[in-house]
């Protein structure tokens, strides 16, 4: 499907006029002094590419985390992310990943496998997360732990909702995020 600039502008105008969900980006930037960072990256205007942002937004709205963690909507930011990673000891990155499997396949890369994730450049984003983490490691102490959780996208077309295969696995992605945080000593209390 080829989109013209008119199609894109029309779609954005319809979205802006809709009663649909709004993402207040400022609300997703917690104080950056926490040692644990939950980072969702992606472009919410491109269906499945926005997976990471959708996941962290939903978790932030649904849970209170103890001890406090930094929950960051990294969107399509690049080096600006370094500002929000000061003092970070552990990072959990949620992203769309091109791994060559069926759409909706969930990937999980623990710290020791992150080099493979970054070396093969399988993130769908052009922003070099590997470069950001390497610069951060030079600036500060190395990370104690890091995990990447991602999903194989079906669509990177213009659209505001993830595709059906990605939507089906979102609950499991959120469960995996909560499990990793629990392993790091973070409890998640459901907001009522």
Task: For each feature predicted by the language model, list its residue ranges.
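N-terminal catalytic or cofactor-binding beta/alpha core of small enzyme domains
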Residues: 2-143, 148-151, 160-171, 179-192
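Short "lid" loop at the C-terminus of a central beta-strand within the Rossmann-like core
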Residues: 154
